[in-house]
Amino acid sequence: MAEISRIQYEMEYTEGISQRMRVPEKLKVAPPNADLEQGFQEGVPNASVIMQVPERIVVAGNNEDVSFSRPADLDLIQSTPFKSLALKTPPRVLTLSERPLDFLDLERPPTTPQNEEIRAVGRVKRERSMSENAVRQNGQLVRNDSLYGISNIDTTTEGTSDDLTVVDAASLRRQIIKLNRRLQLLEEENKERAKREMVMYSITVAFWLLNSWLWFRR
């Protein structure tokens, strides 16, 4: 939406400029230190210039007049004949036996007798395989009915095995989460036990130090 609104704004902006912008007919030059409104009202002699847009701009040196000749580029463009390109109509049907896919290669190697023999052998193999496939398709139509029931059994067994694997993965994930929670609880209990042992150890040491100090004072 932002892109569409920006494009619409640009189109409206350019259209407004092209409609409202006009080239002035005259440019009036006011003398220095003069009031502009008074100058425009009274008019300054020989201070107005008629504004005209030139068709072309020609640069000439040493105050020499240059005849406005025809541009050489335009003559060159009109003199050069346009060459017509002959395009060959493509065939309606493309077959692999008549046209192999080797023409798609950008850099085609030079044709040699060995390459021609290899292509001929490949073409014969393709035709033979196509005929064998046609024969096999007729035989497979009879077997499809018997194989359909077996395939259904296989799909059901595969579906049940997939469901079992999903259930096993979910149960394993739950067990791993429970084990992680138990490990966290054990670590917290060990930390609290270490703190309690440190407090008890410090209390016992302070008690023995106090008793020894009292005994030495006696």
UniProtKB/Swiss-Prot annotation:
| Top-level lineage group | Eukaryota
- Its membrane topology: Single-pass type IV membrane protein
Coiled coil (UniProt feature): 167-198
- Provide the primary localization: mitochondrion
Q: Which GO terms describe its cellular component?
A: mitochondrial outer membrane; peroxisome; synaptic vesicle
* Biological-process GO terms, alphabetical: mitochondrial fission; positive regulation of mitochondrial fission; protein targeting to mitochondrion
Residues on Cytoplasmic side:
1-198
Please list the residues that carry the modification Phosphothreonine: T89
Q: Which residues lie on this side of the membrane: Mitochondrial intermembrane?
A: 217-218
Q: Which UniProt keywords apply?
A: Coiled coil, Cytoplasmic vesicle, Membrane, Mitochondrion, Mitochondrion outer membrane, Peroxisome, Phosphoprotein, Synapse, Transmembrane, Transmembrane helix
The terms under GO molecular function for this entry are:
protein homodimerization activity
User: Which positions, given as ranges, span the membrane?
Assistant: 199-216
Q: Which residues carry this modification: Phosphoserine?
A: S129, S131, S146, S171
Cellular location(s): Mitochondrion outer membrane; Peroxisome; Cytoplasmic vesicle, Secretory vesicle, Synaptic vesicle
PANTHER family associated with the record:
MITOCHONDRIAL FISSION FACTOR (PTHR16501:SF17), TRANSPORT AND GOLGI ORGANIZATION PROTEIN 11 (PTHR16501)
Homology family? Belongs to the Tango11 family.
**Subunit relationships:** Homodimer. Interacts with DNM1L. Interacts with C11orf65/MFI; the interaction inhibits MFF interaction with DNM1L.
- Record's function text: Plays a role in mitochondrial and peroxisomal fission. Promotes the recruitment and association of the fission mediator dynamin-related protein 1 (DNM1L) to the mitochondrial surface. May be involved in regulation of synaptic vesicle membrane dynamics by recruitment of DNM1L to clathrin-containing vesicles.
Q: What is this protein called?
A: Mitochondrial fission factor
